[in-house]
Structure formats: C-alpha cells, structure tokens
C-alpha cells in the first residue's frame, strides 16, 4: 500500500514509523528539513521537502497512484490540511484523511459535506483525547476500557495491586474461581501486559504484581469481575485539571455538561487563564498558578477532588503531578503522556490511566490501511497490541469452520462475538457466521494476517 503523509509532527511521525513497520510504502511531505531529517533516523520512509498544498509537490509525492493520503500537519492551519487532501483526491489518491482543529467541522452535516467533496474522514486529535479522558473518569477501576457494538461487549484493563486477591493465581485457577463465584458471567482473559511485553496467556500463566489484565465480557459482567479482582469503581463528582491546554478546555466543558459538582483548571499563564475564563461555562473555576507546586495545589483544595487530570503539555510534569495527587489521597489520576517510552513508567509510578494522543489517533487512521471489513481499530496504552472489530464477510475464511480448526494466527485472539442483538464470548467450538461482528486482540505483526480471515 502506498501512503502519503503530509506533516512530520508528532502524530505524522508516529504514523510514519508505525505504517513503515507494517510494510507500507510511505512518503512524508513537510516544509521543515529538520523534522524530515529527524524522521529518517527512525523510520524507513521517502521524504519530500516542500509546501504540502503545492500541486507540483503532491504530484512529485505520487498522489496519482497513492492508496491513502493523510493530512496531519498541526503546524499549519486546518485550511492547508483540507486543501492538500482535496488536491490529493483530485490527483488520483483513493482515500484521503485530514486533521482539523475546529469542532464545528465534526458536526454530522459538515462531515457529510466534506465527504461529498472527497475527504473520507476528518479527525481532531485533541477532541479524540478529551473524549477518552471523559471515558476514563467514568470507569475508575480500570486503566483503560473499550466498548464493542455500543456496549454489548466490553473490554476492561485492570492493573493488579500488591494486595489483589488474584496474585499468583493461574489463568485456569482464576477462571474456575470466577465461574464458581458468578456462574452467569461469561468472560475471557485475552492478554496480559507485563514489564513492557504483551503476553497472550495460556491456562498455566500466573498473575504477577503490576500485571495489566485485558478481559472481555458482557458489560453487565464487568462489575463482578472487578469485585473479584479487588477493584472498586469510584464515582467522580469533582475534577481538578492541571494545565489549560486545548484538551483541558474541552474536558472541562464536557464535565460541566455532565453536571459535576466541581471542575477547576490550574494554569500558569495568566493570559490563558483570562481566555479560558471568558470561553468556558461559569461552572468551571480557573486558577492562575503552577501545578508543579504542591503547596499551591493544597491551597486550591486538591485533597477535596475525586480526580486529577494532568494535561500540561509536559510529560514529566504530568506524571509527577499525578503521583503527588495520589499521595494527597485523590482517587483517580489521568496523565497525558506523549513519549511512548514514558507510558509504562507512568503506570509503574501509580498513575491510574494514561492518555496518548498519538496512539488513539493512529488507531483511527490505521483502520484505513486494512480491509473494509474492519469497523474500528484501537491501540491500548501500556501494550503494543491492537484491538479490532471486524464484520465477517460471507465466504470468508473465518466462517469456514469452528475457531479451533481454522489455524488463526497464534499472536491474535478472538475475544467475543456480536450476532444480531446477542453477544457472547468466543470459545474453541464457536463458529463465526457471516455478518457477525468479531472482537479481535492482536500483536502488530499479525494484524495483516488476521485481516485476511475476514475478507
């Protein structure tokens, strides 16, 4: 697959690295020689220096024969991204995607208008991240969660604390004990993230302290699993946000709409504070100060908040702020961490949930590199694996025999199936039927092979 990426910023560079590892032919356009030089040290890509809205540059990049064009430059106006995407489509690129920075563009009628113009998808990384944070504040017992088919199935990620009652249990022992405690709960442990590695567990795999368990079940079964693991879901009614970023602005506005009792933003720049105060609803308190100063946080009442969200734009500051918040007794902490090498560090230091803008955006875009049977793709923080939802095509390989007989890739696992209005956990005797929606957990090197089973 030939893919052209416009923009070698954080998201564009991450996409280039990820997609080049998948074996795609990647060309990156940027007007900064420095950014392009940095990218070539970490990814096998062709680079073109120039204006991404130039027809000559787009022709030189090969838009006439490209399968996918991704306009993802955050350093230009969204107009440049939209213009370059439209030009790429006119020049012959099969599908085009553009980054925007205005929520109004994502209103359904506006998205449809751009679709009619030729842009296949618009995405707004900061909006995606803010939605993820809201979800993390709803599910406080998990480090991450994901719904399939509007909640018919749910995947939850649980970090095992040092006092968890399931430590040293094997998968088989856990399954037997959980089934005995709640016979009606169907579930499957589909992966374990341990010390930076992702394991597809076997029956004799034992649970260790700080393991992250990836469990899929019907939504109504998650509370019983949570209780068995020793987790409690805390009702979040007050949130302190450190940093007055664009993400902070969107999160705080959503929280007020959800009628939380208290929402406060701590921002060091007085000009940004004034701007936020003017733009946000009256239910959001904006305080000018340094979120790295623990004395200041105490003065602002950090101990009285149910959750702290750190989105300052500095990974180290976000992680440390969440660690300090936990010491003050805050029940739920969420940190924005853009350096992938710091994600595991943040989790090891006790941060409850980590948001990575590059990862969640990459999942939305990676879907376009697979077959049209993929409904969505999600990268999970703390693991290098991907979660995908497929629709099984008639006559596809996945429908030809029970799962135990189809030689599914070894580093992938089918977690659950949605068939009409019913959902169930997949087992060896399960036979996938045409048009079933299937939840798959896969390591990156197997995704292309998994894709072939559903075509």
For every predicted segment, state its role.
Residues 1-455:
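Cytosolic regulatory regions of ion transport systems
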